[in-house]
């Protein structure tokens, strides 16, 4: 692909088109809209500039035929070019930083990637500063996330095909929501997909999450369906109270009453 093989590029483009169509379909189910989606190939020109600028600044060393950059405080250097002349993820990540800074000049760039890539981003961020792609006003952040684990607490095995596909999870969540009493399709989707989102967000970002249908769809405790149920009940009470003329002055609540209100609120 990097050498410009036309046949390989056509096959690759077909794979990209099919994948993006599927991604968009799932994003739509989740209510997610992507403003800009640039794949690695988009940065082909930027990658050449990165290599040229790294050489120009004299920060590149040769190691066993590969081109690397030493990173302060790290034993392992960051590889920009393999011995066979192929670029690396790091080179393309640096090209991405270069493009984003020149295009949008953001104050913060957040990378939401697995915790196992921590060293990679420490090195990339360091080299990005060496190349002067980011100024002192720009913060580069790696938000580390954990893994989804099988119900037995072990990693899902992609090689053995023992995984749970997101689309299957969303579909099953909607069906389970119907069994909870959400017979209307729109309501079932709101409850089911909401449960999946809430289950994910209710855990710490860096924590591994054990996949558990019972906790995800529970009608009690810290779950999406329970939060939605509570909200619906609250709205019902407020609607019935519209005809009543009353007001509450928080200044008139005593300490015990305030504690009760705060306990309910949490």
Label each residue range with its predicted role:
Residues 1-266:
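Non-catalytic interaction-recognition regions
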């Amino acid at each position: 692909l990097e050498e410009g093989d036309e046949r390989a590029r056509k096959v690759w483009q077909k794979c990209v088109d099919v994948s993006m169509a599927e991604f968009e379909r799932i994003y739509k189910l989740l209510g997610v809209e992507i403003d800009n989606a640039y794949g690695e190939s988009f940065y082909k020109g930027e990658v050449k500039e990165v290599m040229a600028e790294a050489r120009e600044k004299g920060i590149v060393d040769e190691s066993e035929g590969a081109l690397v950059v030493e990173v302060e405080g790290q034993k392992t250097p960051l590889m920009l070019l393999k011995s066979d002349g192929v670029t690396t993820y790091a080179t393309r990540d640096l090209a991405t930083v270069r493009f984003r800074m020149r295009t949008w000049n953001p104050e913060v760039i957040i990378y939401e990637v697995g915790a196992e890539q921590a060293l990679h981003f420490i090195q990339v961020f360091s080299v990005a500063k060496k190349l002067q792609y980011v100024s002192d006003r720009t913060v580069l952040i790696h938000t580390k996330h954990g893994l989804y684990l099988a119900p037995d607490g072990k990693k899902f095995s992609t090689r053995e095909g023992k995984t749970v596909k997101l689309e299957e999870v969303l579909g099953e969540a909607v069906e389970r929501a119907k069994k909870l009493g959400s017979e209307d399709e729109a309501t079932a989707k709101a409850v089911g997909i909401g449960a999946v989102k809430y289950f994910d967000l209710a855990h710490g970002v860096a924590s591994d999450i054990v996949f558990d249908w019972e906790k995800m769809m529970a009608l009690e405790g810290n779950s999406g369906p329970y939060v939605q149920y509570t909200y619906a009940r609250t709205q019902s009470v407020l609607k019935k109270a519209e005809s009543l003329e009353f007001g509450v002055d928080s200044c008139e609540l005593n300490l015990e009453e305030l504690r009760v209100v705060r306990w309910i609120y949490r």
